[in-house]
Amino acid sequence: MKPSKLLAIAAVIVAGAATTINANDAVYYARGSQLVPMQETDISVSKEVLTFTLGDDGYALVDVQYVFNNAGPAKTVKMGFEATSPYNTGDEPNPAGVHPYIDRFTVEFNGEKLSYTNSLVMPPQPDVPEEFLQYTYVYAFDAPFRSGENRVHHTYRYRMSYGVSNAFMVPYWLTPAMRWANKQIDDFTLRISVPKTEKYFCLVDTLFAGAEFKVIEGTGKVRHNQFEWSPTVFEIALRDGTVEWHKTNFVPSDDFTINSVDCYIGFDESVPVGAFYDRGDYFVIHPYDRKIRKDIARNLPYASRGYVFKRKDLQKYFEQFFWYMPDKNYVPGSDELTPREQRLQREGR
């Protein structure tokens, strides 16, 4: 199939399409104008440190640091950062291969900044009809591997996904790591950081069952939980801090998503108002209990920051929520509220 025809099909699929961006680094060879995934036989992944920084502006910063070991002679390998096409955004596919919701992409190899090229790639889909083929944006670079240890560091920013019942979603591909020689990550660390904000999120525990998430900075709580409509998850509340998961000999058998907790409780009318809260623009209060809504709307921003309420009924109300983490030293100030929180304050008057 010619590349021009591939792009024409992609336009049909993606048009009318929420922002979903998945990513990891993989190995490719070039076939015409296309990049084709391949298996690397000499180079293994010794270490990966993957860090997400979540903000209230709707963006996530991603920092990935790898240590690779090349058991063979020096060689140049084409590596690629993969990101799926946006879904339900109405964006046409970009023939230049630049993803519309990724920016600030950088890559360093053994301390040297590398240039990269952009491509649209069709992953292997042998059983999918032509009209339903899916496409991937790839940021590709030539990595000059020397024999022995090599280090790769890349960063980028992308707009987080969201939905009717999701304030934010951060999907990520881990499975491309299986294309390297050892078919595992010898030493893997996942960090999720929320500087100067609070985030309440969860990750399905299937992939992460071999270890526990730990709060290593700031204020936070972690527990295993299963909501009425959810699989078993790691439920995490984090304020101005970082949570970490670490595993050796990690086999990434699946991909994962960092989901805001409202994805499991957003449509449950039995859940109290305020059971989920986020400071970002896509947080919505579902007015199932209008009698208390104004008090809750007005005070949610301060509860998020740990305010200890003088009104006993309010204090008792917020104490029922896992995300509420009291801080007796916190003194509220209206100038610290996000634009969305200022609107909540006005709604609660």
Task: Indicate where each model-derived feature is located.
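Bacterial N-terminal signal peptides that target proteins for export
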Residues: 1-8
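N-terminal, polar/Ser/Thr-rich
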Residues: 21-58
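Ligand-binding face of N-terminal immunoglobulin V-set domains in extracellular IgSF glycoproteins
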Residues: 63-84
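Surface-exposed, acidic/Ser/Thr-rich flexible loop segments
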Residues: 88, 134-211
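A surface-exposed beta-strand-loop module
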Residues: 105-169, 233-255
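Post-signal-peptide mature chains of secreted/extracellular proteins
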Residues: 248, 264-349
